[in-house]
Regions:
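Predominantly a Rossmann-like dinucleotide-binding segment in NAD(P)-dependent oxidoreductases
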Residues: 130-225, 350
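Beta-loop-alpha module in the N-terminal Rossmann-like domain of NAD(P)-dependent dehydrogenases
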Residues: 39, 50-115
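Hydrophobic residues in well-ordered beta-strands that form the structural core
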Residues: 98, 123-125, 278
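Rossmann-fold dehydrogenase core element
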Residues: 111-129, 149-153
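C-terminal glycine/acidic-rich active-site capping loop/insertion
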Residues: 128, 170-180, 257-331
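Contiguous beta-strand/loop segments that form the cofactor/metal-binding neighborhood of enzyme cores
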Residues: 3, 196, 201-283, 311-323
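N-terminal Rossmann-like dinucleotide-binding module
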Residues: 1-51
Length: 357
């Protein structure tokens, strides 16, 4: 790369902003030129950690855009604000890396795509699970034909709860007041485990299914009496070749990056010629094939630059003109969002729903 990419981080609703800014800070051809958030205290850690000058920190996002003139904006708003924030920032003529999920609804996702189409700039949706080595290895093995055609994906994932950790997975113990105040627990801001985690499973599921869409979806959520959002959901999607399941959970016994809980977090994938289990943060994937039905392990291959994290990958695509592919692409993420929207309606109406379009 010859160009130094100017990057701004706007809206710190999601603590993943710290992780993404660290990736930008560590990139040899990227420079953090500005950060913006209406609550200045939420920027303090980033300012201190990455040596951001006080003049580069703003409480007004438009001033940040006007004065720092970034090439790329990283956005981490609450889920319900993804479309609004894309429409606010896109007119600056910047590329946007949006932290997961895609959007609060399919309609919002289409608004985001339309806003970016007007500028001719790129939009990518980051899913942190896309950068887990076991999942990348599983996808490679599927593409190599090791287990034949994928017929089922089964996903169980989550954590102890969104307030039990911050940037860099630093553990915290949330107070009742923090829970009450957090957007994660507010329905009108896109909170709940379903909207937080189901898109992971469905979007990576699209990747594993090679772009196939289900025909219909049924979903059930828990209904905690003291909360306005769910902490657990189970979605079943019927494809032409079989059923796949996606289970989200806030309240796992342990966080998977510390100790894998039971059930384990990650995927089990069944194909016509074998199976793969690829769990979060593990060193190997486990495979069964016709010739070795007893199963064996394959080491998860390390990720290498420029394919080791979303900032590296997005800048590589922008630099080379290679299209954004896989879960970060709008095309794949939109199918994942179709399944999420259908699941939301199914849970609300308590019935099976044909895939929404």
């Amino acid at each position: 790369m010859s160009k130094t990419w100017r990057i701004a981080g706007i809206n710190f609703d999601h603590f993943h902003m710290g992780d993404l800014l660290k990736m930008a800070h560590d990139h040899p051809n990227a420079e953090i030129v500005g950060v913006a958030d209406e609550q200045p205290e939420r920027m303090e850690n980033a300012i201190a950690s990455f040596g951001i000058d006080g003049a580069q920190a703003f409480t007004d996002f438009q001033q940040c855009l006007d004065q720092t003139k970034p090439d790329v904006v990283i956005l981490c708003p609450a889920t319900a604000g993804h479309a609004d924030w894309t429409e606010r920032v896109a007119p600056a003529g910047v590329h946007i890396l949006m932290e997961k999920p895609f959007a609060a609804s399919l309609a919002d996702a289409d608004r985001m795509t339309a806003a970016m189409k007007q500028t001719g700039k790129e939009l990518a949706i980051n899913w942190p699970l896309r950068w887990i080595e076991t999942h990348v290895t599983a996808h490679r093995l599927i593409q190599e034909g090791l287990i034949g055609e994928v017929t089922e994906t089964h996903f169980y994932d989550g954590n102890r709860g969104p307030l039990y950790h911050g940037a860099d997975k630093i553990e915290k113990e949330p107070s009742a007041q923090e829970k009450d105040a957090s957007w994660f627990y507010k329905k009108d801001e896109g909170g709940g485990s379903l909207l937080d985690y189901l898109g992971y499973g469905t979007t990576l599921g699209v990747w594993f299914h090679n772009g196939a869409k289900p025909l219909e979806v049924v979903c059930m959520v828990d209904e905690p009496r003291a909360l306005e959002v769910d902490e657990q959901s189970i979605t079943v999607a019927r494809y032409e070749r079989g059923l796949s399941s996606y289970h989200t959970r806030w309240g796992t016994f342990s966080d998977p990056w510390t100790h894998q809980p039971q059930p384990k977090c990650g995927f089990v994938i069944k194909g016509t010629e074998g199976t793969i289990s690829n769990y979060d943060y593990e060193k190997n994937v486990r495979v069964q094939t016709r010739s070795q039905p007893e199963g064996y392990e394959i080491p998860a291959a390390p990720l290498e630059a420029p394919f080791a994290n979303p900032v590296q990958y997005f800048l590589h695509c922008l630099e080379t003109g290679v299209p954004v592919e896989g879960p970060l692409s709008v095309e794949t993420a939109r199918i994942g969002q179709q399944i999420v929207d259908t699941a939301v309606r199914s849970a609300s109406e308590k019935r099976t729903i044909a895939l929404l379009d």
